[in-house]
Amino acid sequence: MEGQLLRGLAAQQDCSIREKIDLEIRMREGIWKLLSLSTKKDQVLHAVKNLMVCSARIQAYTAELQKSKEEIANQTGARLVLDSSSENKEGESCRGKIALSDIRIPLMWKDSDHFSNKECTQRFAIFCLFRMGAQVFDTDMVIVDQTVTDICFENVTIFNEAGPDFQIKIEVYSCSAEESSLTNTPRKLAKKLKTSISKATGRKISAALQEESPEACLLAGSVAGAKYHLLAHTTLTLENAGDCFKTHNLSVHGDEECSFWLPLYGNVCCRLVAQPACMAADAFAGFLNEQQTGKGLVGWRRLYCALRGGKLRCFYGPEEIEAKVEPALVVPIDKETRIQAVEKDSKKMHCFSVLSTAAGRAVSHIFAADSLADFQEWMGAFRQHFFDLSQWKHCCEELMRIEIMSPRKPPLFLAKEATSVYYDMSIDSPVKLESVTDIIQKKIGETNRQFLIGRDDQSAAPPWAAVFDGNHEMVIEKKVLSPIGEPAPDGKRKKRRAPLPPTDQPPFCIKTQGRANQSKDSATQAGVSGASSSPSDPRLSPPTHHLQKPVAAPRKLLPARKNSSADIGHTDTKTSLDAKPVPVPRQKSIRDILDPRSWLQAQV
């Protein structure tokens, strides 16, 4: 039964690996199709790089699958499998995370190459490949020329489930990024071969192109002009891990005669961080009773203890860990710590002592478990923790932080050149300044210098334009204002009463008759209109004073208007009338004066 369970777990692991292999195969087929349609140098370089990464992952998964099959085949019985697995489990250390970041590869150019010919420098495409067991990762591709002194990769690569015996192989690949070497993609190369050789061979190549896998026509990774070559490599282990930048040696391949060669300094600088699980999480946690002695008395206090990172932290409850409360007691657990069982106490049976060194002196603590099972679990956790500390070595002295960098902007040499951006811009201006000037000059010539921007060409000229247009006869007419056309006074303004008639003069009376009064009334109206239009005429002012209709004057004088000469004249007339007021009889209204019956009474 146990053997079947183990076989089932192995089968699930094999199924997971096969799914990964199928995924990489589908991705590789898609990359081949994109590569056959790529025409730009950046597209070809990225496609070939991704193709190499997929092939490397397929090889790693295949090797892992073959290794698991061999392990299952070597096991002959279920009992043997169980025994060996339990033995291996006791001898295995905890897993951990490995982070590789901030890779710098210095270059060593000649002075003549670095400081001269900056406009015509050779460019190279560089990327790194990291391998650890079945895990394969890559970095971004960067473009390097003779003006660059360091190859920089800003990626943060994290390997999960790594053991203390890990080995990370760093491979640096290079490819020439010249235009002339990147023009031939697989399909284009095959078409050229088809047209340059015999028809029979051309048909074979055409049939090969119709197949799903382009590898039938051309070998993988050997695309003409876009092949990456191994430039340098190195292997990093636990000894190279640290919480700071370190320099490691590189094994360089090739020489100056190779097209992909770069003058490497022979070193790589990076930050390799190892974070064991026993440092990042609790190895074991549970309740323990600590013995306390004072003044000859022995007491026990119950604490919740957590074993992590070479320390036994004791709290009064598990909720204090979530609240990030300072522990009540911290006991160091390192390679110098000694743990042993003590004699059975009358009250506490499962006791053990922890002898550690603190501040240069030995300190002993006695703990008791609640049951035998808890006691055995704690003893096993201490043994495993000691084994993990011995395997991960200096990585367990202090927790190393893994910094996951936020996405940054691409380096300057990856950005598009300013000249190409300028040429790609499309300035579609509907009208240019020169064309506007030409249109204005043309309009001025057609309209005999009378063109006005924003007006209609056929619009009539203003009346005052004749004054400035040569010698012309002009007729100026006075504008006669009738009383009917005058605007009505504002009803909102306050009016004042007319002054009282003087007492030393007799009241005015009308001595005319019949139609003579009617003609006199018409003459009076004409005189009033003439006086309002031209007050300076002395012939019109006397009848105006004698026959003017009494109108109540306003209480407050209005300000004189300056808009027209007629208003100024009217104001002067009012001023003269106010200076010499003529009394008007208030006993009769205009209706009584115009009534014929009043004329008869006057004659009598």
UniProtKB/Swiss-Prot annotation:
It holds the Pfam family Anillin. May play an important role in lymphopoiesis. The keyword Coiled coil applies. Residues 481-590 are annotated as: Disordered. Residues 1-74 form the REM-1 domain. Residues 514-527 have a biased composition (Polar residues). Residues 281-387 form the PH domain. The gene is Rtkn2. GO terms for cellular component: cytoplasm; nucleus; plasma membrane. This is Rhotekin-2. Residues 53-79 form a coiled coil. It comes from the Eukaryota. The keyword Coiled coil applies. GO terms for biological process: hemopoiesis; negative regulation of intrinsic apoptotic signaling pathway; positive regulation of cell population proliferation; positive regulation of NF-kappaB transcription factor activity; positive regulation of non-canonical NF-kappaB signal transduction; signal transduction. InterPro entries: AHD (IPR012966), Cytokinesis/Rho-signaling (IPR051364), HR1_rho-bd (IPR011072), PH-like_dom_sf (IPR011993), PH_domain (IPR001849). Residues 529-543 have a biased composition (Low complexity). Keywords: Coiled coil.
